C-alpha cells in the first residue's frame, strides 16, 4: 500500500484525513513516523525499481467499496460458522481501511507521475485507459 508513495509536506501532515487520525493520532505521531520512513528508509528501496506500473483506482472511496465487496464474497463463500469469525463487518472494514487512507490518497495523487504505465480502472475494475510515460 505504500510502495512508491512520496512523503507528504508538514502542512499536509498537520490535518487528520479521517476519524481514526483525528481521534487516535491527534498529535500526528504515527503519520509523521510513517512519513519519515517514506522519506528516508524506503527511498533506497524505491530507487531499485526500474519500471513502474500502476493500477489506479478511481478514488479512495472506491478502494473501500472494493474491500467491502471482497469481505462480503469471502463471507458468502465460507458461510457463517464460528470458524470464520475473522470476517470483518462493514464498520470494521471502515476502521481498518482508515489506516491506509492517507497513503492511498497520496499515491493516487503523486504516483502516476513516476510510473511508466498507469492503468486507470473504473468502479468495476475495468481498464478505461492507459497512460504511458512520455
Label for each model-derived stretch:
Residues 2-134:
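Conserved NTP phosphate-binding and transfer environment spanning the P-loop NTPase/kinase superfamily
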Amino acid at each position: 500500500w505504500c510502495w512508491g508513495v512520496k512523503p507528504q509536506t508538514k502542512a499536509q501532515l498537520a490535518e487528520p484525513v479521517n476519524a481514526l487520525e483525528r481521534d487516535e493520532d491527534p498529535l500526528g505521531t504515527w503519520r509523521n513516523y510513517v512519513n519519515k520512513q517514506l522519506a528516508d528508509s524506503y527511498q533506497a528501496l524505491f530507487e531499485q525499481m526500474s519500471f513502474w506500473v500502476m493500477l489506479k483506482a478511481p478514488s479512495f472511496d472506491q478502494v473501500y467499496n472494493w474491500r467491502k465487496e471482497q469481505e462480503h464474497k469471502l463471507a458468502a463463500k465460507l458461510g457463517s460458522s464460528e470458524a470464520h469469525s475473522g470476517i470483518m463487518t462493514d464498520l470494521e472494514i471502515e476502521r481498518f481501511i482508515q489506516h491506509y487512507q492517507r497513503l492511498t490518497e497520496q499515491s493516487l495523487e503523486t504516483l502516476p507521475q513516476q510510473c511508466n504505465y498507469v492503468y486507470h480502472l473504473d468502479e468495476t475494475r475495468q481498464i478505461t485507459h492507459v497512460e504511458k510515460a512520455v
